[in-house]
């Protein structure tokens, strides 16, 4: 007795559903990391926009600008984007704070910093976790990890490879 099978059996359909589920389980976290990295790139872009003003201030005055106003840039809350709440200049360190809404949960309210050090007559910039410089007129340009930002550091996997410098870099 030969019967002609038409369509899919229940087992075949279950296997297809299992494969789709596995693919979704792998793809979804990868996509979330991708969106977080894209949102962090906005913070880096906005922070990098302040580098020239900070460098110019340093070259003209011999010390780091103490705040946004002395650096000649807009106030920290005026420098913002879709995913960035503010960009603050403090003692020559530029710190971007991610927004607390409409942003990936893993980076909500988190921070990253850009800071400069003198090197052979020029200024070299670094990028990484939040740091602070205690004095504008420091002679060694040392920065240290910002302990007030504990729990507010962006996970390294969301930072571009060019933005993973440590506070001791340089």
Swiss-Prot record:
Q: Name one GO cellular component term.
A: pilus
Report the record's disulfide bonds.
127-163
Q: Which residues form the propeptide?
A: 1-7
Name positions with the PTM N-methylphenylalanine: 8
Per UniProt, which keywords does this protein have?
Cell adhesion, Disulfide bond, Fimbrium, Glycoprotein, Membrane, Methylation, Phosphoprotein, Transmembrane, Transmembrane helix
Q: How does it sit in the membrane?
A: Single-pass membrane protein
The keyword Disulfide bond belongs to this UniProt entry's keyword annotation: yes
* A single GO BP: cell adhesion
Query: A Pfam family for this UniProt protein?
Result: N_methyl
In its record, the post-translational modification comment is:
O-linked glycan consists of GlcNAc-Gal disaccharide.
Protein's cellular compartments = Fimbrium; Membrane
Highest taxon listed in the record's lineage: Bacteria
Sites bearing O-(sn-1-glycerophosphoryl)serine, chain numbering: 100
Gene3D superfamilies the UniProt entry points to? Glycoprotein, Type 4 Pilin (3.30.700.10)
UniProt function note: Major component of the type IV pilus (T4P) that plays a role in cellular adherence, microcolony formation as well as twitching motility.
Q: Which family does it belong to?
A: Belongs to the N-Me-Phe pilin family.
Q: Spell out the protein name for this chain.
A: Fimbrial protein
**What species is this protein from?**
Neisseria meningitidis serogroup A / serotype 4A (strain DSM 15465 / Z2491)
Starting at the broadest rank, the lineage of the source organism is: Bacteria, Pseudomonadati, Pseudomonadota, Betaproteobacteria, Neisseriales
């Amino acid at each position: 007795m030969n019967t002609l099978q038409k369509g899919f059996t229940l087992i075949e359909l279950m296997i297809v559903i299992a494969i789709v589920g596995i693919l979704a389980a792998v793809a979804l976290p990868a996509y979330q990391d991708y969106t977080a990295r894209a949102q962090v790139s906005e913070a880096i872009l906005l922070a990098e926009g302040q580098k020239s003003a900070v460098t110019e201030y340093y070259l003209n005055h011999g010390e780091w600008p103490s705040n946004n106003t002395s650096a000649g840039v807009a106030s920290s809350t005026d420098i913002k984007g879709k995913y960035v709440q503010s960009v603050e200049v403090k003692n020559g360190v530029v710190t971007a704070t991610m927004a607390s809404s409409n942003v990936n949960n893993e980076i909500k309210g988190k921070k990253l910093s850009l800071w400069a050090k003198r090197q052979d007559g020029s200024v070299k910039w670094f990028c990484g976790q939040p740091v602070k410089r205690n004095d504008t007129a420091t002679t060694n340009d040392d920065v240290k990890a910002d302990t007030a930002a504990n729990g507010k550091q962006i996970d390294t996997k969301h930072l571009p490879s060019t933005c993973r410098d440590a506070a001791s870099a340089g």
